[in-house]
Amino acid sequence: MGFHIYEIKARQIIDSRGNPTVEADVILEDGTLGRAAVPSGASTGTNEAVELRDGDKSVYMGKGVLKAVENIINIISPELEGMSALNQVEIDRKMLELDGTPNKSKLGANAILAVSMATARAAAEHLGLKVYQYLGTYKANILPTPMCNIINGGAHSDNSVDFQEFMIMPIGAKTFSDAIRMSAEVFHTLKSILSKKGYATSVGDEGGFAPNLKSNEEACEVIMEAIKSAGYTPGTDIAIALDPATSELYDPKTKKYVFKWSTKEELTSQEMVEYWAKWVEKYPIISIEDGMAEEDWDGWKKLTDKIGNKIQLVGDDLFVTNTSFLKKGIEMKVANAILIKVNQIGTLTETFEAVEMAKKAGYTAIVSHRSGETEDTTIADLVVALGTGQIKTGSLSRTDRIAKYNQLLRIEEELGSIAEYHGKDVFYSINK
């Protein structure tokens, strides 16, 4: 048989920002190995599952993860040994039981997720399947429309731009490989435009440029210029997607949004809604993530009522990949899409449940990386397995981001003639 778990190993490794993270090896009785490493975020939702850090300031500035590693070796491994790696749900449930907290603060979501993903990898390897085939079965044939981060601002950079991510989406591409080519061409064109304007072309955490632009609007203007100069039509071939991460701008005391990196302007919730409505009229924006702060549910409702039938409105900090928050959003008719970050919730089973709930309610789902990544490519397989049709995994630079795109290119090749790329049609929450 050989598919039972023989042993689980774990170690502290380094992520793309030089911070420690957890890697786990699940070894089966027949010697099959499944290995996975977990990511971590810079801007985090307050309701996210807890990433266990050691807190010893003299080691890695307190960011060590040896406690999480020990929890895998001393608590999780002895309990999972002998269990079938082919029963992902049972494995994940067992870890949730062992943890016993609502936010995984005892064992750490980073410990639990590493084992959850490594188990799926071991099971797939044992069966001679690719991870996307194992998790998605015969239905896994949709390649995602990528959200490629090309300009960074806010908490991801040191410039005068308030909004965290300006992305492009190649909605007019015919295949995934075309989508990557088009995005790379715009990325390189943007680099030369920024260079000619005298801006720096160094890249941020997620591989996008972080030039010291004069305003938020200028970021959209240079992207439009790059799309056109690369030979594409904005809004038809390539659309703009934003992640302003407004929870980082929101002052809960005054209930105002403070443009702290640029004009120092303060906007009420209603004014922020009007601001986005104007931008959607002015630029070919197809998606806005976290357009309102995570605690501003009223603002979210106003935003959804105002432009939710025109563009994709993604809840990230709002939902933190959690079915209880998503349920509230669905009931209140707030947002129309959810960002799926495996480490926000902590197991593959719960991730599948969140996507299932979103799809049933007519919400779109976008599988996402974090700003602190590794060479692990599980999310590339996951997006195909889940069939969500959208992925957000950074820019067309930095190996930690490119690893995911390259894995998707391999999957597209393997699928051959049954591979599908839906482009603009993935936006079923607005394509009504």
From Swiss-Prot:
Pathway stated in the Swiss-Prot or TrEMBL entry: Carbohydrate degradation; glycolysis; pyruvate from D-glyceraldehyde 3-phosphate: step 4/5
Location(s), subcellular: Cytoplasm; Secreted; Cell surface
A Pfam family it matches: Enolase_C
Binding locations of Mg(2+): D243, E289, D316
Keyword flag rRNA processing: no
Active site: E206 (proton donor), K341 (proton acceptor)
Alphabetized Gene3D superfamilies for the sequence: Enolase-like C-terminal domain, Enolase-like, N-terminal domain
InterPro entries per UniProt: Enolase, Enolase-like_C_sf, Enolase-like_N, Enolase_C, Enolase_CS, Enolase_N
Domain of life: Bacteria
Gene Ontology molecular functions: magnesium ion binding; phosphopyruvate hydratase activity
UniProt-recorded name of the protein: Enolase
Organism of provenance: Borrelia duttonii (strain Ly)
